[in-house]
């Protein structure tokens, strides 16, 4: 999953 990398807030 790449979501965490893009939205790493």
UniProtKB/Swiss-Prot annotation:
Keyword NAD: no
Gene Ontology cellular component terms for the protein in this record: extracellular region
Keywords tagged on the record: Adaptive immunity, Blood coagulation, Coiled coil, Disulfide bond, Hemostasis, Immunity, Innate immunity, Secreted
GO terms of biological process kind: adaptive immune response; blood coagulation; innate immune response
Record's subcellular location: Secreted
Post-translational modification: Conversion of fibrinogen to fibrin is triggered by thrombin, which cleaves fibrinopeptides A and B from alpha and beta chains, and thus exposes the N-terminal polymerization sites responsible for the formation of the soft clot.
Domain notes: A long coiled coil structure formed by 3 polypeptide chains connects the central nodule to the C-terminal domains (distal nodules). The long C-terminal ends of the alpha chains fold back, contributing a fourth strand to the coiled coil structure.
Role this protein plays: Cleaved by the protease thrombin to yield monomers which, together with fibrinogen alpha (FGA) and fibrinogen gamma (FGG), polymerize to form an insoluble fibrin matrix. Fibrin has a major function in hemostasis as one of the primary components of blood clots. In addition, functions during the early stages of wound repair to stabilize the lesion and guide cell migration during re-epithelialization. Was originally thought to be essential for platelet aggregation, based on in vitro studies using anticoagulated blood.
Subunit description: Heterohexamer; disulfide linked. Contains 2 sets of 3 non-identical chains (alpha, beta and gamma). The 2 heterotrimers are in head to head conformation with the N-termini in a small central domain.
The protein's name in its UniProt record: Fibrinogen beta chain
Species name: Papio hamadryas (Hamadryas baboon)
